[in-house]
């Protein structure tokens, strides 16, 4: 598990998506879309599983807790990473965001 500071609370506006990068314990770079909905934070892999497009450039749907790919419109659950609409059929990675004081941390868990 890798815990990386990704910024201060005020760096992440409400109803916004921010692209961040973090390096895990094995030296692999992860690009992650961090979404803020109200006081809740979500983090998913930033690349659409259907097209190699940045999800952080897409549309955030607060009420559905989904992030829509800007290329073909697949929406991904911010809670599970599962696609909610076609053409994507594979999930994207989900990570944890932790708030400590005014600092936000991204938790990357290594999967076997």
Where are these regions (language model features)?
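Positions that flank functional sites
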Residues: 63, 84, 91
């Amino acid at each position: 598990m890798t815990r990386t500071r990704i910024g201060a609370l005020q760096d992440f506006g409400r109803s916004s998506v921010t692209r961040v990068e973090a390096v895990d314990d094995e030296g692999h770079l992860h690009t992650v879309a961090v979404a803020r909905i109200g006081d809740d934070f979500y983090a998913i892999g930033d690349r659409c599983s259907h097209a190699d497009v940045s999800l952080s450039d897409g549309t955030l749907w607060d009420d559905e807790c989904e992030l829509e790919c800007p290329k073909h419109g697949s929406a991904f659950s911010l809670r599970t990473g599962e696609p909610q609409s076609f053409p994507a059929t594979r999930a994207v990675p989900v990570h944890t965001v932790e708030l400590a004081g005014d600092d936000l941390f991204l938790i990357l868990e290594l999967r076997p």
